[in-house]
Amino acid sequence: MDNLTKVREYLKSYSRLDQAVGEIDEIEAQRDEKSNYELFQEDGVEEHAKPSYFQAADDSDTESEPEVEDNQSLYVPDQEAEQVEGFIQGPLDDYADEEVDVVFTSDWKQPELESDEHGKTLRLTLPEGLSGEQKSQWLSTIKAVVQSAKYWNLAECTFEASGEGVIMKERQMTPDVYKVTPVMNTHPSQSEAVSDVWALSKTSMTFQPKKAGLQPLTISLDELFSSRGEFISVGGNGRMSHKEAILLGLRYKKLYNQARVKYSL
């Protein structure tokens, strides 16, 4: 530190400091920039071949685009390859695919009806490969078929497969005609005298209340259904009794549970 301090003090008192700095700058400006390799040559170092990094720089100035060879023009077909077993000469479009029979195996089981001391049990096996949504739809379909049995006799329905699924239709049964001896003074009820319950659509039926203070419930098929077609579409049929048709209408209008609590159905 003492020597460095002395040098600084000496330079402060040196009268020609500015002139010396200017001469040094002038010498540096006139000096040609040379690489370390060229400086070594000036010092008499034995000359050798330029290093690879200098040659790469020199070659970059004279570099030209390489010639692109046409591989297709140089291609010579191998005669032996054409004689290999299984080689088919000609365009691929001429190759005729062979028809192959594909067989899909499945472990699906047909519905099984079992009987034991507890009663009958029907087992339905899910089809394979169903997604979660498809499984839910399949179960909803089975449930809807079972619930529809409340409104019609499934055993009497016709089954028809279509492109969109299955169509089940109610089979219209022709009543048998029996020869009977009429009984005098026998008056059939109004519901028995008609062949189609819808003929009583304007006839009201009355249900008595379970508790005192309530008015009887009087209702007709016309009040529950807008037309016979609507009555049939929800499971009604002409062979129903008048009361069965009325109860069907209450269920259809979602009034049945409320009515059976208050009235004797």
From Swiss-Prot:
Phosphotyrosine: modified positions: Y14
Positions of region (Disordered): 42-74
InterPro entries in UniProt: P-protein-C_vesiculovirus, Phosphoprotein_C_viral, Phosphoprotein_central
GO MF, any single term: RNA-directed RNA polymerase activity
Span list, region Interaction with the L polymerase: 49-105
Principal location class: virion
UniProt-annotated stretches for the region Oligomerization: 109-170
Site residues, Involved in oligomerization: W138, T141
Compositionally biased tracts (Acidic residues): 58-70
Keywords: Chaperone, Host cytoplasm, Phosphoprotein, Viral RNA replication, Virion
Cited Pfam families: Phosphoprotein (PF00922)
GO CC aspect terms: host cell cytoplasm; virion component
Entry-annotated residues carrying Phosphothreonine: T62
Residues annotated as signal peptide: none
Highest taxon of the lineage: Viruses
Annotated segments matching region Interaction with the Nucleoprotein-RNA and template-binding: 245-265
Compartment(s): Virion; Host cytoplasm
Interaction with N(0), as annotated region: 1-60
Domain notes: The N-terminus is disordered and is involved in binding N(0). The region of interaction with the L polymerase is necessary for transcription. The hinge region is highly variable. The central domain is involved in oligomerization. The C-terminus is basic and essential for binding the N-RNA template.
Role noted for this protein: Nonenzymatic cofactor regulating the function and conformation of the RNA polymerase and part of the transcription and replication complex. Binds the viral ribonucleocapsid and positions the L polymerase on the template. Acts as a chaperone for newly synthesized free N protein, so-called N(0). Plays a role in virion assembly.
Subunit structure: Homodimer. Interacts with the L polymerase; the association of P and L forms the polymerase complex and positions P optimally for encapsidation of newly synthesized genomes with the nucleoprotein. Interacts (via N-terminus) with N(0). Interacts (via C-terminus) with N in ribonucleocapsid (via C-terminus); this interaction allows to package the L polymerase in the virion and positions the polymerase on the template, since P acts as a bridge between N and L.
Name of this protein: Phosphoprotein
